[in-house]
Every structure is written in structure tokens, then in C-alpha cells.
């Protein structure tokens, strides 16, 4: 059975017929095992498992935040007003794939609308567009 096409922790749990809470998945960066809460957040954030030599890895919350910060510091390109991004890509913001600049979560439609209503800027990092999700917007970071 080829598991390398499995992208979520929940799907891996089902494919292996192991209860979700019993599945151990190491972080790709720090190699600590993800907690059950982190496994749930990994799937909720719509992140994908990493397969290397038939071993699976995910990303813990601490490392996700550190990677986001490093990626922003090293690969930041520029910031745009929402209208500029929509004009550049010729589509409304709700149709554009955005991830959180702080925690890597994929933004929902309501979070994208909150970015628009708050007049926040959208950042281009590594040729991908990023803004803050609703939870990270609560913190002044």
C-alpha cells in the first residue's frame, strides 16, 4: 500500500487503521512528536504531510511559527493593498489562496473578508500571498 499520496493526519490514521490519538507523527524540523492538538491543527490549517524515504513528517505549532517568521525575514518581496493584489491577479481576494503570515493556516473566506474590511496589507513572500488569520490578528506581532 502506497501511503505517500496521503496528505492529512486524519487520512493517514484511516489508511493505517490506527486511532487518531494513537498515531505518532514527528515534526519535520524539531523531530518531537506532535500532540493530539497539534495533529488536529495541522489538518485544520490544511498543511500537508511530508514523505521522505517512506517516513512521514508533519510540523508542530512552534516550528510552524518559527518557519513562518524565518520565511518572512528571508524571502519577503513586497506588500500590497488588497485592491492591488486583486488587480495584479485579476480576481477577487476571496478566490486567491492566502496563508497566514504568522502561523501558516490557510485563510478562510471570512478571514479574507476581515483583511479587506480592516484595510490590512497582503504580503508577497516566496511568490505566495500572505495575511494574518483571525487568531493571529488578535495578537500584536
UniProtKB/Swiss-Prot annotation:
Family: Belongs to the papillomaviridae E6 protein family.
GO cellular component: host cell cytoplasm; host cell nucleus
UniProt KW keywords: Activator, DNA-binding, Early protein, Host cytoplasm, Host nucleus, Host-virus interaction, Inhibition of host innate immune response by virus, Metal-binding, Modulation of host cell apoptosis by virus, Transcription, Transcription regulation, Viral immunoevasion, Zinc, Zinc-finger
Zinc finger residue ranges, unnamed: 27-63, 100-136
Compartment list: Host cytoplasm; Host nucleus
HAMAP family: HPV_E6 (MF_04006)
Function: Plays a major role in the induction and maintenance of cellular transformation. E6 associates with host UBE3A/E6-AP ubiquitin-protein ligase and modulates its activity. Protects host keratinocytes from apoptosis by mediating the degradation of host BAK1. May also inhibit host immune response.
KW Ribosomal protein (keyword) present: no
Matches recorded under InterPro entries: E6, E6_sf
Gene3D superfamilies: E6 early regulatory protein (3.30.240.40)
Protein name: Protein E6
A single MF term (Gene Ontology): DNA binding
Pfam families linked: E6
Gene Ontology BP term (one): DNA-templated transcription
Quaternary organization: Forms homodimers. Interacts with ubiquitin-protein ligase UBE3A/E6-AP; this interaction stimulates UBE3A ubiquitin activity. Interacts with host BAK1.
Domain of life: Viruses
Amino acid at each position: 500500500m502506497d501511503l505517500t499520496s496521503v496528505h492529512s493526519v486524519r487520512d493517514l490514521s484511516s489508511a493505517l487503521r490506527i486511532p487518531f490519538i494513537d498515531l505518532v507523527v514527528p515534526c519535520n524540523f524539531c523531530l518531537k512528536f506532535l500532540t493530539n492538538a497539534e495533529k488536529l491543527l495541522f489538518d485544520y490549517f490544511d498543511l500537508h504531510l511530508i514523505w521522505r524515504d517512506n517516513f512521514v513528517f508533519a510540523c508542530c505549532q512552534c516550528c510552524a511559527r518559527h518557519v513562518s517568521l524565518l520565511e518572512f525575514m528571508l524571502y519577503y518581496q513586497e506588500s500590497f493593498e488588497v485592491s492591488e493584489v486583486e488587480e495584479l491577479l485579476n480576481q477577487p481576494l476571496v478566490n486567491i489562496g492566502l496563508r497566514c503570515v504568522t502561523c501558516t493556516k490557510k485563510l478562510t473566506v471570512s478571514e479574507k473578508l476581515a483583511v479587506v474590511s480592516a484595510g490590512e496589507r497582503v504580503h508577497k513572500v516566496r511568490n505566495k500571498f500572505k495575511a494574518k488569520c483571525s487568531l493571529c490578528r488578535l495578537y500584536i506581532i
